[in-house]
């Protein structure tokens, strides 16, 4: 799993991912040059599994390249992931940050890879810049958003296509 953002939210997303899935390596990328030695040690201790390595990545590209699941947990106003559809293809992207219309973590390349985004609540389309900006620019239509409750109430199928990119935009509802 790759984590963009070495703050409290990133810490707990990494921890939860390791509980929910069989993760062998957590790749952490932070946009600043802050020394993450203590952060990585605390995360490794909290995960409490000697089979899970915690690795700091120098670039977002390195983190994305090495990760199947990517969680973005930043207050950025610019995309934190590379705008490279080849790098993003086949990834599961979970965007946790971007909680105002001015914030943005996810690049436009995502819309070349998927025509749908899973959301918790309809107001995500207004609240998050990751959705409101692409809607305003015509790259995303509100009809392309799928409520997680609707998806889960259906008969969700396991995604077996390794090239399929999935995108979930969270606005902070703790259920998902």
PLM ranges: what are they?
Residues 23-24, 88-91, 114-115:
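A short helix->loop->beta-strand "cap" motif at the edges of active sites that frequently abuts
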Residues 1-18, 30-35:
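Glycine-rich adenosine-cofactor-binding loop
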Residues 66-67, 114:
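An anion/phosphate-binding loop that grips the pyrophosphate of nucleotide cofactors and donors
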Residues 19-47:
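NAD(P)-binding Rossmann-fold cofactor-contacting core
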Residues 61, 65, 77-92, 105-108:
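Rossmann-fold NAD(P) dinucleotide-binding segment
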Residues 99-176:
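Adenosine-phosphate binding glycine-rich loop
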Residues 68, 74-76, 97-98, 122:
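Short glycine-/small-residue-rich Rossmann-like dinucleotide-binding loops
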Residues 52-62:
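Short acidic-hydrophobic, aromatic-tinged amphipathic segments that line or gate anion-handling sites
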